[in-house]
């Protein structure tokens, strides 16, 4: 008799032209991810082959009970690392039945920014460093920490190896490989300064694809931690006190920045970001004031400053960029729970479209 694992791993392509499409969307909190699956005829090679779908928005905090239908528009497809075969993950955004984006649909406005001719011409690249914390399920305390207690102070844990320094590497590696399988442009992982905290990087990816990939990478991480019985936290300061917070540093460049003379373009872009500091901070994640204190490799939330190789700055420029006169900059302000559609779109809008009055 087949066991559960055998059934889960059934290869449907041997007996059917049907595949499973897992539709994913951002829920009512603006940070939670929801998904449900449907059967479609495969293989699917382009998102235009997929039908729209709907869900009960009153159960996700996105619609009233008396008019609860929200429509899912498929926007990007990825290979499914859990079901494998020709099965797919589908990143969607959400609309009313009348075709209006609902308030939590931040992709719609980002897509407008990224389709603007001035933005398209500059081919914006993003590299997003997603930090996160793994928590023990029943006590909501970081993985590897004694329950109700604390490990030794920070110092030995960053990029470390060893049972007393690195906690959850099997989860991190499983996620890494699953993202590569899915077709996400994941460029690396590392252990972070606080024990139980890790980071993965997505990019360089162009425009809105970077944000789609971060959301799907988060979804895959939620699924991996679900299997492992561990809780994923994107809280920007999960443990108060002398512990690093969690951010989503966003590296950015345009065609002009990557060409000779690009360093001057970078400096002009940073000047614009300085003028809109408050607007960016307001959009860069909930609870970020607990993280951006001027300590633990952050700039104070109320102060904008930039520097070369300065990890205590709002914007950091790398030594190589300064030396070569071209390259990219890193916006260190976004929190780990930021919406990548909002952050990527806002950086492009401020640096490429915004005009000072």
Curated annotation (Swiss-Prot):
Keyword ATP-binding: yes
Functional description taken from the UniProt entry: High-affinity glutamine synthetase involved in ammonium assimilation. Plays an important role in the primary assimilation of ammonium taken up by roots. Plays a role in maintaining nitrogen metabolic balance during ammonium assimilation, thus controlling plant growth and development. Reassimilates ammonium generated during lignification within developing tillers, which is probably required for the outgrowth of axillary buds. Required for nitrogen-dependent biosynthesis of cytokinin. Active cytokinin in axillary bud meristem is required for axillary bud outgrowth and necessary for tillering.
Organism listed in the record: Oryza sativa subsp. japonica
Disruption phenotype: Reduced number of tillers and panicles.
Quaternary data: Homooctamer.
Protein's UniProt name: Glutamine synthetase cytosolic isozyme 1-2
Cellular compartments per GO CC: cytoplasm
Database matches in PROSITE patterns: GLNA_1, GLNA_ATP, GS_BETA_GRASP, GS_CATALYTIC
């Amino acid at each position: 008799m087949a066991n559960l694992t055998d059934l889960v791993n059934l290869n449907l392509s041997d007996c059917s032209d049907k595949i499973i499409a897992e539709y994913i969307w951002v829920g009512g909190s603006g940070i939670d991810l929801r998904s449900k699956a449907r059967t479609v005829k495969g293989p699917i090679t382009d998102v235009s082959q997929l039908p729209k779908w709907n869900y009960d928005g009153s159960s996700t905090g996105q619609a009233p009970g008396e008019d609860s239908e929200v429509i899912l528009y498929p926007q990007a497809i990825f290979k499914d690392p859990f079901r494998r075969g020709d099965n797919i993950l589908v990143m969607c955004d959400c609309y009313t039945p009348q075709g209006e984006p609902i308030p939590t649909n931040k992709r719609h406005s980002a897509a407008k920014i990224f389709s603007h001719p001035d933005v398209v011409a500059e081919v914006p690249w993003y590299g997003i460093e997603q930090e996160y914390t793994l928590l023990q399920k029943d006590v909501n305390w970081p993985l590897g920490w004694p329950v109700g207690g604390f490990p030794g102070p920070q110092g030995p844990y960053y990029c470390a190896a060893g049972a007393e320094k690195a906690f959850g590497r099997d989860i991190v590696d499983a996620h890494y490989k699953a993202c590569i399988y899915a077709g996400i442009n994941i460029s690396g992982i590392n252990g972070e300064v606080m024990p139980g905290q890790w980071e993965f990087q997505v990019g360089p990816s162009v425009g809105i694809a970077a944000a789609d990939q971060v959301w799907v990478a988060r979804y895959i991480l939620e699924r991996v931690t679900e299997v492992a019985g561990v809780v994923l936290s994107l809280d920007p300061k999960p443990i108060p006190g002398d512990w690093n917070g969690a951010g989503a540093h966003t590296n950015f460049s345009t065609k002009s920045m990557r060409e000779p003379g690009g360093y001057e373009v970078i400096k002009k872009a940073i000047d614009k970001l300085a003028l809109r500091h408050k607007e960016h901070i307001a959009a860069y994640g909930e609870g970020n004031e607990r993280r951006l204190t001027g300590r633990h490799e952050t700039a104070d939330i109320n102060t904008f400053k930039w520097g070369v190789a300065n990890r205590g700055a709002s914007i950091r420029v790398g030594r190589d960029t300064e030396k070569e006169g071209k390259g990219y900059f890193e916006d260190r302000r976004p929190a780990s729970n930021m919406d990548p559609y909002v952050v990527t779109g806002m950086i492009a809008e401020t640096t490429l479209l915004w005009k000072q009055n």
